[in-house]
Design a protein with these regions (language model features):
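Short, solvent-exposed turn/loop segments enriched in Gly/Ser/Thr/Pro and often Arg
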Residues: 71-78, 160-162, 197-206, 226, ...
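Core alpha/beta catalytic barrel or barrel-like domain that forms the active/cofactor pocket
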Residues: 21, 154-163, 193-201, 254, ...
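Hydrophobic, small-residue-rich alpha-helical packing segments that form membrane-like cores
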Residues: 204, 209-218, 249
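Conserved short loop/turn motifs at secondary-structure junctions
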Residues: 194-205, 364-368, 488-489
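CE4/NodB-like, metal-dependent polysaccharide N-deacetylase domain
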Residues: 175-200, 341-353, 357-362
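His/Asp/Glu-enriched short active-site or ligand-binding loop at hydrolase and phosphoryl-transfer sites
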Residues: 218-231, 397
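Active-site and substrate-binding clefts of carbohydrate-active enzymes
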Residues: 9-69, 74-117, 124, 128, ...
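Well-ordered mid-protein domain cores that form the structural environment of catalytic cofactors
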Residues: 110-196
Length: 496
């Protein structure tokens, strides 16, 4: 007997709204001249552990007719890599190697009951990734995102061209303008329409950037909480309603700290639960080097494979085997807890406001599935519970909210980012501040070259375009972040 499908709760007029934003970005890394480049694995890992699992989960929601609206920010550098034939072919080779490794692991663990189900889980996952990537999407995940946007469940927004940290480009205003305008143009090429919103890289806002957004036809952006709370004049509704930037007409939505901490924090948030998979125990480091060598860096440097057999367990190196069923039960509990807290939050805010409050919850997309393995299923449980188990909070996008609430308070947001301590300490410090005078020099040389060769032929124009590409790629916020974090520093310096 077929189980009847539960009816969705009427969420047409909830007391308030939850706006979930998934920001997907990776730095532009493409080395066709090298047979193997470890840094390209950042993309391949994200495809396998994050993008495909999330897309598969959202497909299931659509097939089950579960109502939802989710915002995605896809950076132009990520879209460029996802649509690049060289990287697409390399991903197929990458996933084929993982399938082979998972098959070996199923054989190795067949008499190890504590690990064999997990080994099979990975094999099934890798086979699904290959099927979706090659058979379903013809190696083009961007088309899959576009399909879900056209279906009305995603709102996809853009970001700056190469994810340049815009507050660091205040002294290179032409570069900041190019980052914004090219971010819009890139989006139009992939999605066949103009973006409604723009993700400011690292949520980096400085007073005046809204005029660049207005010039590009951008309607809204997201800010960290203090960017809204310290606005002038003081925001009437805190972060629970957008502000309209003075003289620009662009809306600024503030991040909600409570919903952020619940998911971001490994110590206080859900991802630190002891039943969840341990990120740092990978067979690339645990197993014999001769066994694992064909699946790691060819020169023999140990690296992650994505196959991990242990759960967090606790603050100890003695980890217990991962049990998928236990982890999923915890994910369902945590989804219910998150929903309950948002219901109470909306109940309280709605009692104090003359409009429906909005809770903005932005996250790095790579958190879901990569850092927090159970993240995609947590999100799946949350969306289903919100559709069928309550009627206080609805899911919406920023565009949805602005359409329903076109009149909002005018104010000037405060300088801010979502980085450490809320300002620019990560991207401008003693480890990386040497790059910013170079940006100004590059901008001056680029401007001079354009003036000198304005009437030049096609070859000179190609050279100018290449100069512009190199300049934009050097401005990516990722290189400054890597220099500060102390990992892969030599690579970041070579790219900057």
């Amino acid at each position: 007997m077929t189980r009847p499908r539960p009816e969705a709760v009427d969420n047409q007029s909830p007391k308030g709204w939850l706006c979930i934003v998934l920001h997907a970005h990776l730095p532009y890394i493409r080395h066709p001249e090298c047979e193997f480049m470890l840094e390209e694995n950042w993309l391949f890992e994200a495809i396998t552990e994050c993008y495909i699992p999330l897309l598969a989960m959202f497909d299931n929601l659509v097939n089950d007719r579960v109502p939802f609206r989710i915002t995605w920010s896809l950076s132009p550098t990520l879209c460029s890599m996802l649509t690049d034939p060289v990287l697409q072919q390399r991903y197929v080779k990458y996933i084929d190697r993982l399938i082979n490794l998972a098959e070996m692991e199923c054989e190795r663990t067949k008499r190890m009951p504590e690990f064999r189900d997990t080994a099979r889980m990975y094999l099934d996952k890798f086979l699904l990734c290959r099927k979706m990537f090659v058979d379903n999407d013809s190696c083009d995940l961007v088309s899959h995102f576009r399909l879900l946007q056209d279906a009305g469940v995603f709102e996809i927004i853009t970001s700056a061209a190469t994810h340049g940290y815009l507050p660091a480009l205040q002294n290179a205003p032409r570069s900041a303008r190019a980052q914004v305008l090219l971010g819009k143009e890139s989006y139009r090429r992939w999605f066949g329409r103009d973006p409604a919103g723009m993700w400011l890289p690292e949520c980096g806002y400085y007073p005046g950037v809204e005029h660049l957004l207005s010039e590009a036809g951008i309607s809204y952006f997201f800010s960290d909480a203090h960017g809204i709370l310290f606005a002038q004049p003081r925001p009437r509704y805190g972060v629970f309603a957008p502000l309209i930037c003075k003289d620009a007409g662009v809306a600024a939505f503030g991040r909600d700290s409570a919903s952020s901490k619940a998911v971001w924090s490994a110590k206080e948030g859900y991802p630190g639960d002891y039943h969840y998979r341990e990120f740092y125990r990978d067979i690339g480091f645990d197993l014999d080097i001769d066994y694992i060598r064909p699946y790691i860096d060819p020169i023999g440097i140990r690296s992650t494979t994505g196959i991990k057999y242990y759960k967090i367990t606790g603050k100890t190196e003695d980890k217990k085997p991962y049990v998928r069923e236990e982890a999923l039960r915890r994910a369902a509990v945590h989804a219910g807890n998150f929903m309950f807290n948002r219901e109470k939050q909306i109940d309280y805010c709605a009692s104090l406001m003359d409009r429906q409050p909005i809770v903005v919850a932005p996250y790095d997309a790579e958190l879901f599935g990569h850092w927090w393995y159970e993240g995609p299923q947590w999100l799946n449980f949350l969306i289903r519970k919100m559709a069928f188990e309550q009627n206080t909070v609805g899911l919406c996008t920023a565009s949805d909210y602005l359409s329903a609430n076109p009149v909002n308070q005018e104010a000037g947001p405060s300088f801010s980012s979502w980085g450490y301590k809320g300002y620019s300490e990560i991207w401008i410090n003693g480890s990386n501040d040497w790059i910013y005078p170079q940006f100004q020099t590059m901008e001056k040389r680029m401007s001079d070259a354009v003036e000198t060769h304005r009437e030049a032929g096609s070859l000179a124009k190609r050279a100018l375009n290449q100069m512009a590409r190199e300049q934009l790629l050097a401005q990516s916020s990722d290189w400054a972040f890597i220099m500060k974090s102390g990992t892969m520093v030599n690579y970041a310096q070579s790219e900057d």
